[in-house]
C-alpha cells in the first residue's frame, strides 16, 4: 500500500486495458454533447481528444511556467458557461514534467466539491521521480473519492509498456460507469497479463527502483549534454521527459518545423510541442527512452547542427564522460 489509502476492490477499483483505454471509455460513459471539460494546455492528447470524441467541449487551461496553474483553473471555472462537468489532470505531467504536491490536490478537491465538478487524474508516472521527489496521489486527500478517480498504469513503473494493463480507482459511481461501458466494448484484459500484474504489484519492488534510477541517469546525461551545447533547460524532477524550450535563434520556426530540422540535420527525434496544445508550440519534448550511449549520440548530433548554423561556440565534447 504505497499511499495508505483503503479502497473497496469491488466498488472503487477496475482493471483497464492500459490508462488510455480507460480514460477514453470513461469519457464516453460520463460526458454528453455540450458538456464542458477543463484540460491543461499543453496536455497528453487522450486527455483532450477523449473528451472531444465523447462530444464534449474543451476549455483549455494554460499550464506554462509563466502562470500559476491553479489560478488559471479557478479562472476557467468562473468564466465557463455552462459550468464544467469534469477536469482532466495528470501529474507528473506529460509532456511538461510539471509536478505538484499534496496541497495542490487538497485545493483541487475542495474546488471540485464547491463547483460540483468531477476530477480525473492520470498518475502514469507515480514512481518516476528524481532527487527525492515522490508524486502524491489525489486519493490521499480525505473525501477525494466523492469527486475524483485516478488512473495508474504498469507501463512505466514496471517497464510493461505494450502489455496494456492498468487500473482506475476512486469514486464508485464513475467506476460503475466505466464497468458498464467496458462490458459492451471489451471482455477485459487477458487473464495471464492480470496475473503477471498482480505478481508485479505484490512482489519485491526493487525493479521499480531500478527503472526509476535508469530514467534518472538518462535524464542526467541528456540534461548535461544539452546545457553543454548551450541549450538551457529546466531539469525535470519526475516523468520520463525533458520539456525543452526551443533555443531563441530557432523560436520563429515553431515546434513542428524545429522538430523536423532536428530529425533531418541532427538525426534526433523529438515531439513538437504543438502536438500537445497551442501553448506547447515554444517547446519540444525529449523522451528518455534510449540508453545513455544513444543519448550521447543524440547530443553530439545536436551540437553538430548548432556548429553548422554558426549560432553557438560549442565547448569540448564531454558527452562520453560519465555523469557524477
PLM feature segments, named:
Residues 2, 6-324:
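PLP-dependent class I/II
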